[in-house]
């Protein structure tokens, strides 16, 4: 499941209808008073979260959205019909930013969340409102007010349970293919993943969780280098991070960077982008063990863990051969179960 996770759109609320200049004209009442009605209000623009959507790809082509204008007022004090509101649907997890001010105006995290993004203009007053003791036949009415116009940036933050992070070619796409039905592109060159991919991991008893494959990070990603910078935000809503590292000597690490330095480099990028990401539970997955003899792979893994002073869980796997991958998924499910129990106990203690 590939995602387009950024889009920029323009929204135009409807203008209000104009007020009417009219006079009552009936048989036997040739000089009736003013009876011009008010214009209808313009339609507003809303954005609503829909759990059935998972990408912003539709906004690549449809970028301009206009609500209906209000109808003009009419004689006999008839009000103009209000313009219909326009509702734009986006995936759950979409953040809405006002481009003019760079202000976040909404964060739609639940199905059905709805946000007003452009208010329709009010209808103009008809001349019936301007009658006075000195002006019995006013020829004055007000035009409708213009509707709001905004340029909005939409950013999709994935609502995944687990986020995969690591350098390019660490094997993230291979792992997500191994443990879910997702089929991201896999090849032997960096930056194979150009968009985030989601996969649903099914564990025993029909339970499941969502895992996200984030494009590879490199040194300087938080400052815009490589492809990873724009995707770091997807990690913010995950409950657990799996940090994949290529330990195979045949690969030479990544561009000659040792596994230990790979880990530390990405930790620096997380720190730059959002220090809170380093506070999330993060497990170490040492991948490509199939490219080494078993005892060599185990010794290399233990050395890496020791050099890092790693205290969290760690695993030695071959994502390509699916060796050691499913025990990790079961362990993750058990971890989430404990999280839920702890949250329930905390609520009951209040």
From Swiss-Prot:
Q: Is the keyword Disulfide bond in the record?
A: no
UniProt cofactor(s): Mg(2+)
Residues holding Mg(2+): 173, 193
Enzyme Commission identifier(s) = 3.6.5.-
Start and end residues of each Obg domain: 1-159
Q: Which GO terms describe its biological process?
A: ribosome biogenesis
Mind listing the GO molecular function terms for this protein?
A: GTP binding; GTPase activity; magnesium ion binding
The terms describing its cellular component in GO are: cytoplasm
**Binding-site list for GTP:** 166-173, 191-195, 213-216, 287-290, 318-320
Q: Where in the cell is it found?
A: Cytoplasm
Q: Where is the OBG-type G domain?
A: 160-337
Q: Where is this region: Disordered?
A: 127-147
Keywords for this entry?
Cytoplasm, GTP-binding, Hydrolase, Magnesium, Metal-binding, Nucleotide-binding
User: Out of the domains of life, which is the source?
Assistant: Bacteria
Name of a matching Pfam family: GTP1_OBG
What's this protein's function? An essential GTPase which binds GTP, GDP and possibly (p)ppGpp with moderate affinity, with high nucleotide exchange rates and a fairly low GTP hydrolysis rate. Plays a role in control of the cell cycle, stress response, ribosome biogenesis and in those bacteria that undergo differentiation, in morphogenesis control.
Q: Which family does it belong to?
A: Belongs to the TRAFAC class OBG-HflX-like GTPase superfamily. OBG GTPase family.
Q: Its quaternary structure?
A: Monomer.
Entry protein name: GTPase Obg
Give the species.
Stenotrophomonas maltophilia (strain R551-3)
Encoded by which gene? obg
